[in-house]
């Protein structure tokens, strides 16, 4: 199966090279593949033994297009995309504002013929999903496309899911779901043979009731819908659409879930582009005023923490990837850290190594916290920190992070019963990566900072093995930005 999958990925991706010469980006190509594969699968579903009502209007099916060549093929494909963009339901969402970006008719014909040769419906969802995930990863690897910011390393996603241990008939949300990686990992975990052996009702709920997603970027939203569809999540011909399009931070969506697994987009500030009186475009900080938020701020990640707290059930649990600044930023950052300690059980922080994200120099962490019923007592008693960053170095190509690299953290986390944990750090073993801190210790720290490290960084003492220049530059820029924001906050306070 692996050979078949990799062969199809190679075939499909091999078509992209000549398209690149015509100025078609990886993202555009992946979008066109989404449209074409969907049309082919709909054609297969319309035939025996399925005989489904696909919703594709007569005259605009795969069969109406697949035998054409040249200008006729281009014209039919263009007309098909326009017609389908006018449809309702999930069909209209996938094809919204769809246009043909493959101007070379000969290459379009070759792609259509290549897709036509495969029986997509009879392929297992594992194979289809792996093919599409493979293409999404190749798209993420294209630095120019910027798609990497929507792609969380799959080993990290799987580790987060294993720590949360989702159960059947429970709901899972990702408020910025990108291409759907967290949902697919949760589905894989739930359907692993021998784990739960789900009955018919549980399987139906997994398909149509488990997942609640949102995505801000239209093209990524389409890729996500297709990715979930290929993995048998949601009903493309029904009313169940597991993902919505829009700014998830604008309002409380109303639903409450058992688990949140997410990696909010990198970048501190939310902003909107405005046109001033002189006709010039300016960016203004976007501030969300929501009654359910603890504090008003333009910091995107801090707002996501508040949003996640809202959508969790009273006993809900979350695992969230967040940048370092969330751990130490003053002002709103300190308020939110204190609120997390007081109202949730913030029990675990995984400090991530650099070199695992497609955006260079990113320093991030995974925060694990459980929501608790309202109480005057501080809910967080101890915070366990696993330092997976100091003296750990990965690269995307030569030395990528694997599932095996996260096994020690999962063992320390002890998902079976996290109340039975043992530190690996001690005065006798100062390089132990797993260490416990009491809430009292944290509250005594300047600004209630959670930016804690204790292992000696060997690279700082070894001038021949300094961090990558991009990483150093990113650190300098981040430190300057943090200093500037602190000065700005001080100035605002002095004006009062």
What positions do the PLM features span?
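Conserved RecA-like P-loop NTPase ATPase core
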Residues: 224, 263, 285-286, 308, ...
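Non-catalytic, mostly N-terminal accessory regions of nucleic-acid modification and defense proteins
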Residues: 1-168, 232, 237-248, 351-355, ...
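Short, surface-exposed amphipathic charged segments that create phosphate/polyanion-binding patches used
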Residues: 257-258, 362-368, 399-404
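Short loop segments at secondary-structure junctions
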Residues: 42, 370-374
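Conserved Class I SAM-dependent methyltransferase catalytic core
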Residues: 29, 216-221, 294-369
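Conserved S-adenosyl-L-methionine
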Residues: 146-262, 267-274, 278-280, 290-292, ...
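Short, contiguous acidic/charged loop-to-helix segments that flank catalytic cores in large enzymes
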Residues: 271-299, 324-332, 353-359, 374, ...
């Amino acid at each position: 199966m692996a050979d078949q999958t990799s062969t199809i990925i190679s075939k499909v991706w091999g078509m992209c090279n000549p398209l690149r010469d015509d100025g078609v980006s990886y993202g555009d190509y992946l979008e066109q593949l989404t449209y074409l594969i969907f049309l082919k699968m709909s054609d297969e579903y319309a035939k025996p033994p399925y005989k489904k009502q696909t919703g594709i209007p007569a005259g605009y099916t795969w069969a109406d297009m697949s035998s054409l060549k040249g200008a006729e093929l281009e014209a039919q494909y263009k007309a098909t995309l326009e017609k389908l963009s006018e449809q309702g339901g999930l069909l209209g969402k996938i094809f919204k504002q769809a246009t043909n970006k493959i101007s070379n008719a000969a290459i379009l014909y070759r792609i259509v013929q290549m897709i036509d040769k495969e029986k997509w419906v009879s392929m297992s969802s594992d194979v289809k999903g792996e093919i599409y995930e493979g293409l999404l990863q190749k798209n993420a690897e294209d630095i120019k496309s910027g798609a990497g910011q929507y792609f969380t390393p799959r080993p990290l996603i799987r580790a987060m899911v294993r720590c949360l241990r989702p159960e059947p008939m429970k709901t899972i949300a990702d408020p910025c779901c990108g291409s759907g990686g967290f949902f697919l990992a949760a589905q894989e975990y739930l359907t692993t043979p021998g784990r739960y052996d789900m009955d018919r009702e549980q399987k139906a709920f997994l398909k149509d009731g488990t997942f609640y997603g949102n995505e801000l970027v239209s093209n990524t939203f389409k890729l996500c819908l297709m990715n979930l569809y290929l993995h048998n999540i949601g009903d493309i011909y029904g009313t169940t659409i597991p993902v919505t399009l829009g700014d998830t931070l604008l309002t409380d969506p109303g639903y409450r879930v058992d688990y949140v697994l997410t990696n909010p987009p990198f970048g501190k500030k939310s902003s909107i582009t405005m046109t001033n009186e002189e006709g010039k475009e300016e960016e203004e900080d976007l501030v969300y005023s929501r009654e359910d938020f603890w504090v008003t701020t333009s910091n995107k990640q801090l707002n996501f923490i508040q949003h996640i707290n809202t959508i969790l059930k009273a006993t809900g649990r979350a695992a969230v990837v967040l940048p370092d600044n969330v751990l130490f930023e003053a002002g709103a950052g300190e308020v939110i850290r204190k609120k997390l300690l007081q109202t949730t059980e913030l029990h675990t922080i995984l400090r991530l190594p650099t070199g695992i994200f497609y955006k260079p120099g990113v320093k991030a962490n995974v925060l694990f916290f459980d929501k608790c019923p309202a109480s005057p007592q501080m809910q967080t008693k101890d915070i366990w920190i696993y330092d997976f960053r100091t003296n750990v170095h990965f690269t995307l190509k030569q030395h990528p992070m694997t599932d095996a690299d996260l096994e020690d953290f999962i063992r320390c986390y002890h998902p079976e019963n996290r109340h039975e944990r043992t530190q690996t750090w001690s005065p006798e073993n100062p390089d132990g990566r797993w260490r416990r801190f009491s809430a009292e210790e944290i509250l005594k720290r300047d600004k209630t900072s959670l930016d804690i490290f204790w292992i000696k960084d060997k690279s700082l003492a070894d001038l021949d093995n300094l961090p990558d220049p991009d990483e150093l530059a990113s650190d300098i820029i981040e430190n300057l930005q943090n200093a500037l924001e602190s000065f700005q906050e001080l100035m605002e306070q002095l004006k009062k």
